[in-house]
């Protein structure tokens, strides 16, 4: 088994992900943190001397490089995962007051599921552990390395550290993997900004390693998910019910034992 990372979702998002066997990527400009992947994370003020030997002024170079960084942000889609499945805050924020689901994904299997030409520049997403900073360090933006791009993609404020985020990052994903969300599809005449369009990567059943149900999960929804997953997605998946620990401010997973009707489909 490879590294397991977790996706926190409300019940509708979980059913979409499980039912469609896919992973949703969101444009970097559309995230809930305005600092995310922002061009100002990098410093373009110290223009290298060799760029100033011609007639082009320093201000032009600074504006150009900042625009390039902005375009990189607008051309990048990512999927946010977590190293942990028991964050009380994430269960509250992303699973609508612990009513949702946390899905464990085997990242080795996920990377093996990447479809052909998912990205126009890179064939596979980058897997980046988010780095949390107390200050904006603003490294030199003229160091033309992939590490510099990674800094823009993976740097967040210290306040977000509880999320223990790992990102799958794909610059310029192929348009063939773009699709409207169910909510967007309800408004077929609406004109959407291209950055509002999500991209979806199909997953094999073995990518789904575990499913954790929130403390306040609706029991009927829970049963529907278990039956669907065991019959049509991955019969070997592990199910857990999150419980409140009576002795500490933490959540404890409890194994969901299969019913006899479940075993008959194994």
Give, region by region, the residue ranges found by the protein language model.
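Partner-binding and oligomerization surfaces adjacent to conserved cores of proteins
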Residues: 1-266
